[in-house]
Amino acid sequence: NIAADISRTPPIEFNPFSGAGTYPGAVSYFEQRRVFAGTLNAPQSLWMTRTGTESNLSYSLPTKDDDAIAFRVAAREANTIRHLLPLDSLMALTAAAEWRVTSVNSDAITPSSVAVRPQSYVGAGQAQPVVVNSSILYGAARGGHVRELAYNWQAGGYITGDLSLRAPH
């Protein structure tokens, strides 16, 4: 007898950007995926396309490693993701914190291996951050200070430092 293989479904189409309040405010690229974040209706959610595509957000059941990824940053405060910046990890900056989006292991990000960890609780302003070498320069959300976010191997993560030591900008 020949039986149907129902262990994997065909790709299921998904479009989270269809209507008022659903358009992303931050877009970037990371590990061959286009990343969207910061909608009005889902301010702490991120969507990553299928590997190697610009807008394909389809997924299968059970999930495959190249499927689209959708998740929400669970934080103590609800803040819209303002900026996405690709470094060694994907950095998501909100008005109250800086988040590191990475894999739970050292492999690529997949639907089953995505992890989000806070790096600091300073927050970024509306001005577009600048990547210089392997650091991010950004305006703080409060106080008018310019800050640097860079990896520190002793801390095992990204730390932020104030570059406006003498006067705010």
Region roles according to the model:
Residues I2-T9, S60-A70:
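Acidic/polar, low-complexity linker and loop regions
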Residues A37-D67, V101-P111, A115-R117:
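Beta-propeller domains
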Residues I12-E13, A68-F71, A115:
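Short, flexible loop segments at the rims of nucleotide/cofactor-binding pockets, characterized by
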Residues G25-V27, R33, N41, R72-H169:
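Beta-sheet-dominated scaffold domains
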Residues I2-D5, Q32, T39:
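Generic structural motif
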